[in-house]
Amino acid sequence: MTVRAALVFLLAVGLTGCVTSGDQNPLKTDKGRDEARDAYIQLGLGYLQRGNTEQAKVPLRKALEIDPSSADAHAALAVVFQTEMEPKLADEEYRKALASDSRNARVLNNYGGFLYEQKRYEEAYQRLLEASQDTLYPERSRVFENLGLVSLQMKKPAQAKEYFEKSLRLNRNQPSVALEMADLLYKEREYVPARQYYDLFAQGGGQNARSLLLGIRLAKVFEDRDTAASYGLQLKRLYPGSLEYQEFQAEK
């Protein structure tokens, strides 16, 4: 289970935005420098999205040459190093980004995701909590989902449930969050709401070993033998070597 970083394009600025006619140097004006910086960031993100991290560094470095304090450039470079499994360098870049823009919810959310991957759960929680304060952040539902996932790792299921509920209030179309709610409620023996959340998950989520096992367990609670059998066959066919299949066999 991983926390999803909300990596988005920063500005819709193309490289052609930096080109001017004549002998005028666009980097001599504030507007020209801003456009050049943003174009380089866009180019770097394009390489990053295609999985070419080495090539992504070149335009991102150029962006930082133009604007050494660019939070967006540092944040993008942090994701590059995170992808390359260079945690120390990624951490440094995230910190530089936040030094320039300490309230940037996107950077805080991405940094929280990085800290989660590093199992630094207390730090991740604090960064994500800061990100959640931005009520206008368009990916706020993802922040609450991430807070819920971190809370689970901190052994705080009640707190996790509150965050998952907040996430779903902001965006109902999140199968992964619905599955987390179904799992928590099943463990609390709240079977009716657990099934409701599971049905919400099933409407838009692809099944995996974990979800199939939960579906089997819920079907058994409600004595739905056909559904339990169907999920059992899928689990056997698709995930025969999984821990979930072993648990399913043991529970027969």
Swiss-Prot record:
A GO-annotated cellular component: cell outer membrane
Superkingdom as given in the UniProt entry: Bacteria
Topology class, membrane: Lipid-anchor
Residues covalently joined to lipid (S-diacylglycerol cysteine): 18
Principal subcellular localization: membrane
Keyword terms: Cell outer membrane, Lipoprotein, Membrane, Palmitate, Repeat, Signal, TPR repeat
Lipid-modified residues, N-palmitoyl cysteine kind: 18
GO process annotations (BP): pilus assembly; secretion; type IV pilus assembly; type IV pilus-dependent motility
TPR repeat ranges, renumbered to this chain: 32-67, 84-101, 104-133, 139-171, 174-203, 208-235
Keyword Lipoprotein included in the entry's annotation: yes
Pfam families per record: TPR_11, TPR_12
Disulfide bond entries: none
Gene ablation phenotype (knockout): Mutant shows an impaired export/assembly of the fimbrial subunit PilA, and accumulates this protein in the membrane fraction. In addition, loss of PilF expression abolishes multimerization of PilQ.
Keyword Membrane found: yes
InterPro entries reported in the protein's UniProt record: Pilus_4_PilW, TPR-like_helical_dom_sf, TPR_rpt
Subcellular location: Cell outer membrane
Alphabetized GO MF terms: TPR domain binding
Residues making up the signal peptide according to the UniProt record: 1-17
Job of this protein: Essential component of the type IV pilus (T4P) that plays a role in surface and host cell adhesion, colonization, biofilm maturation, virulence, and twitching, a form of surface-associated motility facilitated by cycles of extension, adhesion, and retraction of T4P fibers. Plays an essential role in the outer membrane localization and assembly of PilQ into secretins which are dodecamers of PilQ.
PANTHER family documented for this protein: BARDET-BIEDL SYNDROME 4 PROTEIN, PTHR44186
Entry-linked NCBIfam families: type_IV_pilW
Self-association state and partner proteins as the record states: Interacts with PilQ; this interaction is essential for assemby of PilQ into secretins.
Entry comment, domain topic: Contains six tetratricopeptide (TPR) protein-protein interaction motifs. TPR1-TPR4 form the minimal region required for secretin assembly and function.
Protein name: Type IV pilus assembly protein PilF
Source organism of this protein record: Pseudomonas aeruginosa (strain ATCC 15692 / DSM 22644 / CIP 104116 / JCM 14847 / LMG 12228 / 1C / PRS 101 / PAO1)
